[in-house]
Amino acid sequence: MLRRLVQQWGVAVFLLSYSVPSCGRSVEELGRRLKRAVSEHQLLHDKGKSIQDLRRRFFLHHLIAEIHTAEIRATSEVSPNSKPAPNTKNHPVRFGSDDEGRYLTQETNKVETYKEQPLKTPGKKKKGKPGKRKEQEKKKRRTRSAWLNSGVAESGLEGDHPYDISATSLELNLRRH
């Protein structure tokens, strides 16, 4: 009995492990067939999309052609001597009443016509006015140069001098913060 069971299991394993051709094709060929079916499916999908896109283009082209010709048809149907429809009223056209000028902003009341400004050249830069900070720096430089020229630096009284730059700059820094 054990021997018979081993034989059956051996045959089953052999059949499962060996690729048996089905309908004359091996298992590998069946796999290729499935792959080919997927690529064919993709091809058909792409064809369908391109056909749908082509139909949409034709539809839009036809629609645009109708829009362009509709204006021509509308103007050609109206004869030059035709009367207006009875429900329309002929109101006189008024251009600018006297009340309009009172309520308009200054921008719209300008009498001057618009003048185009000349294009600015990128090379030219506008000189700005020197700021307060620059003026202070210039004063410091002047006092420093005057201080060095007067010979106070060589006298050894640097810390006791009322115009000591290091003391004034320290005081300025403390005042700022």
Swiss-Prot record:
Family matches, as PROSITE patterns: PARATHYROID
Domain of life of the source: Eukaryota
Region annotation (Disordered) ranges: 74-177
Biased composition regions of type Basic residues, renumbered to the chain: 122-132
Ranges annotated as biased composition (Polar residues): 76-90
InterPro entries to which the protein is assigned, alphabetical: PTH-rel, PTH/PTH-rel
Ranges of Basic and acidic residues composition bias in the record: 109-118
Function of the molecule: Neuroendocrine peptide which is a critical regulator of cellular and organ growth, development, migration, differentiation and survival and of epithelial calcium ion transport. Acts by binding to its receptor, PTH1R, activating G protein-coupled receptor signaling. Regulates endochondral bone development and epithelial-mesenchymal interactions during the formation of the mammary glands and teeth. Required for skeletal homeostasis. Promotes mammary mesenchyme differentiation and bud outgrowth by modulating mesenchymal cell responsiveness to BMPs.
Protein name (record): Parathyroid hormone-related protein
Originating organism: Canis lupus familiaris (Dog)
Gene: PTHLH
